Amino acid sequence: ANPFMWRFHAVHHSIQYVDWIAGSRLHLVDILITRSFSYIPLFILGFSNDVFYVYVVIVALQAVMAHTNVRIPFSFLKYLFVTPQFHHWHHSKDKETHDKNFAIHFPFIDKIFGTYHLPTEDWPEEMGLEDESFPKGYLKQQIYPFFNDPKNSTPTNQSLR
């Protein structure tokens, strides 16, 4: 994980209860940068507006789905597509799962990069940041990354420091 980006993405990870709306809880800088990595290539490669609109809808639906608290057994599909169980491990406070499950759509990407973590039936026990002083409230969280060292808002994962 990138320490500069983490200071903004920490807003998304500050939630202690992951639910369907959590996919929309983001810092504005995080939105700008991450969306740019998707949208600019679509534009440069000349995809039509219709393709872009379909992509945006798919990404929005996937974000909602990945953050829901449904414990549906996805069977073999959980190895093909990001599921709530897979993504909840990305939000876990468990030190062994930090820097895991970065994929947005396809878990095989994490398999390739060695960041895949999906216990058979287990779900994380706790989510959120270790830093209890991380601010609550939308405006405070939008301002916080500009005036605080990212080390102060990281999970306990030493690789981010």
Can you say where each PLM-predicted feature lies in the sequence?
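Membrane-embedded alpha-helical segments that form the functional core of polytopic membrane enzymes
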Residues: 1, 53, 77
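Juxtamembrane helix-loop transition segments at the membrane interface in multi-pass membrane proteins
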Residues: 1-11
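Cytosolic/stromal cytosol-facing helical appendages immediately following the last transmembrane segment
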Residues: 5, 14-25, 46, 62-161
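Membrane-interface loop-to-helix entry segments
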Residues: 23-40, 49
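Hydrophobic alpha-helical transmembrane segments
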Residues: 32, 52-54, 105
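Alpha-helical transmembrane segments of multipass membrane proteins
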Residues: 35-44, 60-64
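Transmembrane helix interruption/hinge and helix-loop junction motifs
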Residues: 44-52
